[in-house]
């Protein structure tokens, strides 16, 4: 056997040249205290706010408090296996979530991990959950409509792309249903939807996912779920995680809609964390920065200017009130941050007016500029008619001898209230809304019995679809009522009324 010394020396030389001395440096600390989803860690001197720390067993924690000799960490999972003295490692990463089309149609937890049993999320891009909102120069005023398919909202409190419209009301008044309808209405649009469930029951989230699937809306929707059984830090961070995923579309020149259900529970989770981290309590035991908690989240919803891609992110935050008290701490905070609110009332809900929207207390501060012209033309007088109706209805209880004008207003108002009722999960296209409201506001329904208004509307829309499809098509294309369309609509109504039996 001949030993080739040259060959051996070449191999040794190449090995020496390719040798890399790698030393993995990691800053570690020690758990001083753990309990209630909070850990105090000593030794990680260079930790950053919102940085992820790794605990034994792969559990992650997020740095929230930076103190003189230790850091307060919110644990993003169960703390049962962590004990005092355990080693903790810095990751050097700020909390980020996967973004892009890979998350569409999925049900995720706030860490971006799938919980729908459909395999991993194959995303190449990640985005930090906490990002600065666009500045003043980067924004453009809200001017494009975002129809929700709900007549009462599209007519009187219209929502534009890039707006923040609060949905507020007591428990069981249909707040989630209104927002789910808004998601269903985006079916044939270019809007990507996100539903963030914070502190909800698991059965509720399963029902929402099932409803979206049944109506074919899940393909353009992502659900981020932090249910009531999850630790408070996950409930707190869920809204920001959902917002980061939705912002990806805003910054790519596309459009997104995000529903936060609900921010009252997020504030409660944040209060729990803050008190456990020994931050000083303020009003209603909330920490001093609870306003900033919501403002920095909702300011990220914006209409971006053309030079940045003209994308938009529309937010529908939900707030649950206690016994109709909209002047409590969290409701007033969020009302002052948002661009208007849709107020749902239990009295209306129990009276069978559903969606139970109180059109007197509901406002849209910027949506008017985004409202479709045709809708403006038919719904312009509607708010006034309904306000007069409510005022007169209160007086009419005391006296029976009313003059003709008052009776006419009461009759018209009763029919408008009936017209604004709508079944759940049946959003209405805007051209059909315009057609039915035109009939009501121009007096074509004044002689129809109140009990038959819904029947009149359904049959009239069916008649238009079958026999007068060109009217609906022209409304859809022109987005306004000109003399030609108005003449054809009047003729169609007169023709339909001849054959209609209440």
From Swiss-Prot:
PROSITE patterns: ATPASE_ALPHA_BETA (PS00152)
Enzyme class: translocase
Lipid bilayer topology: Peripheral membrane protein
UniProt keyword ATP-binding, yes or no: yes
Main location: membrane
GO MF, one annotated term: ATP binding
Subcellular location: Cell inner membrane
Catalyzed reaction equations: ATP + H2O + 4 H(+)(in) = ADP + phosphate + 5 H(+)(out)
Site (Required for activity): 362
The keyword Nucleotide-binding appears for this protein: yes
Binding, ATP: 169-176
EC assignment: 7.1.2.2
Pfam families associated with the record: ATP-synt_ab, ATP-synt_ab_C, ATP-synt_ab_N
UniProt keyword list: ATP synthesis, ATP-binding, Cell inner membrane, Cell membrane, CF(1), Hydrogen ion transport, Ion transport, Membrane, Nucleotide-binding, Translocase, Transport
Gene Ontology CC terms: plasma membrane; proton-transporting ATP synthase complex
InterPro entries per UniProt: ATP_synth_asu-like_sf, ATP_synth_asu_C, ATP_synth_asu_C_sf, ATP_synth_F1_a_nt-bd_dom, ATP_synth_F1_asu, ATPase_a/bsu_AS, ATPase_F1/V1/A1_a/bsu_N, ATPase_F1/V1/A1_a/bsu_N_sf
Protein's job: Produces ATP from ADP in the presence of a proton gradient across the membrane. The alpha chain is a regulatory subunit.
Family per similarity comment: Belongs to the ATPase alpha/beta chains family.
SUBUNIT field: F-type ATPases have 2 components, CF(1) - the catalytic core - and CF(0) - the membrane proton channel. CF(1) has five subunits: alpha(3), beta(3), gamma(1), delta(1), epsilon(1). CF(0) has three main subunits: a(1), b(2) and c(9-12). The alpha and beta chains form an alternating ring which encloses part of the gamma chain. CF(1) is attached to CF(0) by a central stalk formed by the gamma and epsilon chains, while a peripheral stalk is formed by the delta and b chains.
Record protein name field: ATP synthase subunit alpha
Species of provenance: Oleidesulfovibrio alaskensis (strain ATCC BAA-1058 / DSM 17464 / G20)
């Amino acid at each position: 056997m001949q030993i080739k010394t040259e060959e051996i020396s070449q191999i040794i030389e190449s090995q020496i040249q390719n040798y890399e001395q790698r030393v993995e440096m990691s800053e570690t600390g020690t758990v001083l205290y753990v309990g209630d989803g909070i850990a105090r860690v000593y030794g990680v001197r260079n930790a950053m706010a919102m940085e992820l720390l790794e605990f034994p067993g792969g559990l992650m924690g997020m740095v929230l408090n930076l103190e003189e000799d230790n850091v307060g960490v919110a644990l993003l999972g169960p703390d049962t296996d962590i004990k005092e003295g355990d080693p903790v490692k810095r990751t050097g990463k700020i909390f980020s979530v996967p973004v892009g089309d890979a998350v569409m149609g999925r049900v995720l937890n706030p860490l971006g991990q799938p919980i729908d049993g459909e395999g991993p999320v194959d995303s190449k891009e990640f985005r930090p959950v906490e990002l600065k909102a666009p500045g003043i120069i980067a924004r453009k005023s809200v001017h494009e409509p975002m129809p929700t398919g709900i007549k009462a909202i599209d007519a009187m409190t219209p929502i534009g792309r890039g707006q923040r419209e609060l949905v507020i009301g007591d428990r069981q008044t249909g707040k989630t249903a209104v927002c789910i309808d808004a998601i269903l209405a985006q079916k044939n649009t270019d809007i990507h939807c996100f539903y963030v469930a914070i502190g909800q029951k698991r059965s509720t989230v399963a029902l929402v996912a099932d409803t979206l699937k049944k109506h074919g809306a899940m393909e353009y929707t992502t659900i981020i779920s932090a249910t009531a059984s999850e630790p408070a830090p996950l409930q707190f961070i869920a809204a920001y995680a959902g917002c980061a995923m939705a912002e990806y579309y805003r910054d790519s020149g596309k459009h997104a809609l995000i529903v936060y259900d609900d921010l009252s529970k997020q504030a409660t989770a944040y209060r729990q964390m803050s008190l456990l981290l020994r931050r000083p309590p303020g009003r209603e035991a909330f920490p001093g920065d609870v306003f900033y908690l919501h403002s920095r989240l909702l300011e990220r919803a914006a209409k971006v200017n053309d030079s940045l891609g003209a994308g938009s992110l529309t937010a529908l935050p939900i707030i649950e009130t206690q016994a109709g008290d909209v002047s409590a701490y969290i409701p007033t905070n969020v009302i002052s941050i948002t661009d208007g609110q849709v107020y749902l009332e239990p009295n209306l809900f129990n009276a069978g007016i559903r969606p139970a929207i109180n059109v007197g207390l509901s406002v849209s501060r910027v949506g008017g500029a985004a409202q479709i012209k045709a809708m403006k033309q038919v719904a312009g007088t509607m708010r006034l008619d309904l306000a007069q109706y409510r005022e007169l209805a209160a007086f009419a209880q005391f006296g029976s001898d009313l003059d003709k004008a008052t009776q006419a207003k009461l009759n018209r108002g009763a029919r408008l209230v009936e017209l604004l009722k709508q079944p759940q999960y049946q959003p209405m296209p805007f051209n059909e809304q315009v057609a039915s409201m035109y009939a009501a506001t121009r007096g074509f329904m004044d002689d129809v019995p109140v009990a038959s208004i819904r029947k009149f509307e359904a049959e009239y829309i069916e008649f238009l679809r079958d026999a007068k499809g060109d009217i609906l098509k022209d409304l859809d294309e022109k987005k306004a009522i000109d003399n030609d369309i108005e003449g054809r609509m009047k003729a169609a109504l007169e023709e339909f009324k001849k054959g209609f039996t209440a």
